[in-house]
Amino acid sequence: MSHTITGAEPKETNTFFGHPRMLANLFTVEMWERFSFYGMQGIMIYYLYYTADKGGLGLDKDMATGVIGAYGAVVYLMTILGGILGDRLLGPERTLFYSAIGIMAGHISLSLIPGVPGVVIGLLLVAIGSGGLKSNASVLVGSLYSDNDPRRDAGFTIFYIGINTGALLGPILTGWGWSFGGFHLGFGLAAVGMAAGLIQYALTRNNLPASVHHVGTPFTGAQKRNFALALIGVVVIIGILLGTGLMTADNLKNWVMGFIFIGAIALFVQMLTAKDVTSDERSRVTAFIPLWIANAVFWALYQQQFTVMAVYSDERLNWNILGMELSPNLINSINPIFIVIFGAMFSALWTKWGDRQPVTTLKFSAALIIIGLAFWIFLTQAGVQSVNVGWIVLILFVCTIAELIISPVGISLATKLAPKAHRVNMMALYFTSVAMGTVLSGWLAPFYSMETEVPYFTWMGIITIATGVLLFLVHKPVQKMMRGVK
């Protein structure tokens, strides 16, 4: 998906920390979107597997973690659809606006519609909306600055702070709502947050640069028809699978994993065999194969903070702090704190090192080894009846360090390795690796229990560290295949 729209020159009058005034608007809408997204996701798993007397649906715990993993994967797949809509059909601004409406509608469904129907409708709307908003928000931020504006990087840093502020506050407030009024009050607070962001955005959206209100490379009539038929075909196929009972909540993660795998293979084959791809570009696409696998392995562990770690937080952690019994979903507020604190530090570090910084393959390798070691920290608390919250803080701190090493370079690498005629496909390929890791976080969860935590965390560390070491051993030939890309 193209993020090349830059828009008009910024106005001289700056009213938001020396930046264009509309940055405050985009900061706020993204903050509220992340507030609602992480706030809802933080309590959703408990809503799924808690028994009815606790306000939940009473699903099997393994089924619940599988649904969460599949849902998270679909969100990343929807970023591909959102990018296409923004680039080719609606334009980035309208795509973001309609996506925000969809997110709000999803949270309202979760708060008002009881039972499984509310979950299905709500999660589907939130997944589609989040994908559209996630893939177009940065385009709108970029449109506020010219390409050579020295404030550009600082503007994205401020925007990034907004994202993590929302991710920090969301679980805190929805957890409070859950504690005092049940799950549906928590979902309702997520809906209110998204509504607040949507209202303030709608009032000033026309002040954005003209470029984001237009379609950069519109579909031709035939392309538009084929796109519509493809979407209808996907909906029909999924409807048939659901109607015949072949796709159920219990095996949803397997279907999603299969779709992602087939899609990734198709994208690789398409780019490797295309006639408009040069030999250098083909070599770069081939070099992305081991990095695609490494990226999927990394996110398979990292995203377990919404599956395995959420269950661990509920069953193993002592959330009684200073005499107050806190909600287990607060585990999801820990990572954003570290990102805000250390994100700018890592950015400055890479800038200072310049050409002396490690090549991308070594960064991937280091991130895998570090997150594998983070999972081994769980072993120190094996057999402890009530684990101190400080241990999960330490584990997530180490996970965040790994994320800050690998996450920023992932998208950048995909854009640098992409064939000129297939940039959208390469970005789609990158997001399939994140989606694969996310669905794996749900697929792996049934192997975890209080009784199996030692072998589980041991093997998670072994597999991930081994993958990192293997990537380190082959990093020179992989870098050579990148043909000059670092």
Segments the model singles out, each with a brief description of its role:
Residues 1-19, 147, 175-306, 310, ...:
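Intracellular loop-helix junctions on the cytosolic face of multi-pass helical membrane proteins
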Residues 42-65, 305-329:
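Short amphipathic helix-loop junctions that connect adjacent transmembrane helices
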Residues 65-86, 333-346:
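Central cavity-lining transmembrane alpha-helices of secondary-active solute carriers
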Residues 79-113:
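Conserved MFS/SLC helix-loop-helix module at the cytosolic interface between two early adjacent transmembrane helices
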Residues 88-100, 352-369:
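Cytoplasmic membrane-interface "Motif A"-like loop-to-helix N-cap segments
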Residues 101-119, 366-385:
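C-terminal ends and interior cores of transmembrane alpha-helices
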Residues 106, 117-133, 386-405:
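Hydrophobic core of transmembrane alpha-helices in multi-pass small-molecule transporters
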Residues 151-171, 178, 186, 191-197, ...:
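Glycine-rich segments within core transmembrane alpha-helices of 12-TM secondary carriers
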